[in-house]
Amino acid sequence: MDVAEASTMRKGKSRNFATYDKVNQSSPTPRYKVVRYGAGYFYAFANDWQFRTALSGQWSGDTLIQGEQMRLGGADGVRGFSEGSETGEVGARMNVEGYLPTYEAGDAKLRALVFWDGGKVTAKSGSSIAISSAGFGLRSAYTNQYSFRMDAGRIMKAGNDPQQLKGDWRIHASLSATF
């Protein structure tokens, strides 16, 4: 479990600070405060089956620049949505995952999973949006040097983006190498 607070250094003027949000022209608060929190739970069953859940969120009474707002969509958020597809000053998201046993062949490991992700954000204006998805994924590693992650998420509850509709699928994938 974790809790963190972030704030500005009491510098800047709102007329200058608004230059960070030329898209939405939201007039962000120059002296903002944000409280962020998170908690997680992991349980390993017999025969290498695993369960994991995580909750994260934030609260702010101020209008925030885009970089400080809570973002829901993406590979590390609500999978099945594009990165940061829904944003707000206040929000929470939850991830629930079930992992199948690891398959090993020599130095290679492969594990499959199923997941449900959901979240809700509220903007300073008072508008709120909730989104959710469900899907499956793979985690693979070769020695300790290479890893692969792939998640395919199906939108269960769509947000405001007319190009991300209920029933749509999106794949998030990454390949990493450590030297």
List each language-model region with its residue ranges.
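Hard-cation-handling environments
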Residues: 1-18
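C-terminal transmembrane beta-barrel domains of outer membrane proteins
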Residues: 21-179
